[in-house]
């Protein structure tokens, strides 16, 4: 022991490069390594070793690997290089006299340490750039996605560049020196300026991109469960609660997406992280991992997990780069002014070594999906967590079917107290064959209500619908993979409910446009209507650029069929407050016929006959869809829309069960929804056209103002017809 301590406190044979020679002086030691410093370095090295091994094992055993997880895995390899470098230097403290191999070992130690330092900082910038790109890339770039081979290629390129820069002293530019705490670069060489230039460039780019990312990921004005990617939903992305049983094909599985991104403006289209399944060949890239395997967490926990990965990776990137900042600044100061301080040198080295110990924090994102939190992000468990943890949480005796006519399509979102064998899935049953006793009676009691009701959609289809390939049928049956492509058919989309409650439909499929399609005489499940695109639905690249500044505000023109009884048919709207944290007003029950479908409040200073640029106010009812037992059945939302152009559509929303909320979809064309309700008197049939433009709201408001009490909106007429139908059925 005394032999070891004497080496530490007396002559440690540390190297110092001679300024007059390119050879290293092996016998001169500028300072000594104290026992406390030696123990501290050993502890930090051991912590970095354990952490890097833990990170590698955890990340390599992930069932679904994302781009971020692969990049962080390479970070762990850099940490191992750092551990190896410091371990080599620690070995050099043992011999009492310098050996012939000391110079080679010290050079190797310095080379590895500088290589991993450069690689770690460059990858930190790369990770931040990737996060910024995926959350802000334009719609036109949606078709391009990172493949596994590309990710590995970028990682190897960073390592190659780092090794090239670190090996320049071996080529005669700069030298490595031995210090009391490690083998590092001689600060008197101009080589230091090159290192600082590379680091400063990476740090500058990281700092610029981190400002908006920090706001989006840590200080976002949106709620924690941010709204889903519109492009992902419009492509038919599967959502939590969708049955994942074998042989069951969902509506166009997601394009290797892991998370819905955050809100962005200026025409950007938030994108999602790419998932690589185990054993996926590099050449197949994003297209190979499209199918969800039953029982995997990808369909249930992917959103909060991937969002947490982005948050943790951002924090780790900033941490690593900042921990290297003191060393880089000190090296430049020493080179420029010749300032030298052993305590500062030691502190900067320890901080750079500490940067190799923080990588395991990324693995915690799997368990701390709601962290890190900051600003206004709520760290407490929220009502949305039930939808993401895959647990069975049943409502107390309440179930309904919610049918949406929106964005040129009809969507039915069931919510029942029936669950299949998959613990992560909610079972959706055919409306004519409900397995829940609670739904059999309403359908039987109200069969007459649906005997002759026809709901049709009249649209003006766009001329440039986007091309989409790899379409799966929206069916719930076992079908071979070779038959997953849609069949092209001509016809009109309609849903008819007849006396035997059979649903018959014909679909339209023109060119690349997707339509709902079913095999002949096949009786679809309710899941057939989940996130299936209709013929004329807008595609992301056709979105109008004239939307409102705030994507989440309101929508109108959506028809909602409430409850299996079908007694009421109402327009629905939804609004999140400006801060995105709560819904106003408070949840309460409102009778549909008392609510205003669309309304207009002109400026009191203006003439009643003039309708300039004012706000359109909508008072409507929407069913709240969540697994919270304490939640009320309905909420009433008030929405305000202000548009400068009378012809521009106001934003629309669609419901996302994955988010348990409505999400924005900005549409650029006008559409109207036609409802035909036959009565016993052929002359009394009601044909209602519900427009959804701001101008239509103003016209309705003008009519309401002019006709006063005599004016009735379409929804009021429809409810009156339902009440009349109900009275006739009771009279019979």
From Swiss-Prot:
Residues 511-526 have a biased composition (Basic and acidic residues). Residues 281-302, 501-526 are annotated as: Disordered. GO terms for cellular component: plasma membrane. Disulfide bonds join 106-183. It is a multi-pass membrane protein. Residues 1-36, 91-110, 178-190, 333-343 are extracellular. It is found in: Cell membrane. GO terms for molecular function: G protein-coupled receptor activity. The chain crosses the membrane at residues 37-57, 70-90, 111-133, 157-177, 191-211, 312-332, 344-364. Signal peptide: none annotated. The keyword Protease does not apply. Glycans are attached at residue 7. Keywords: Cell membrane, Disulfide bond, G-protein coupled receptor, Glycoprotein, Membrane, Receptor, Transducer, Transmembrane, Transmembrane helix. Residues 58-69, 134-156, 212-311, 365-732 are cytoplasmic. The keyword Ribosomal protein does not apply. InterPro entries: GPCR_Rhodpsn_7TM. GO terms for biological process: antral ovarian follicle growth; negative regulation of ovulation; preantral ovarian follicle growth. Orphan receptor. This is Probable G-protein coupled receptor 149.
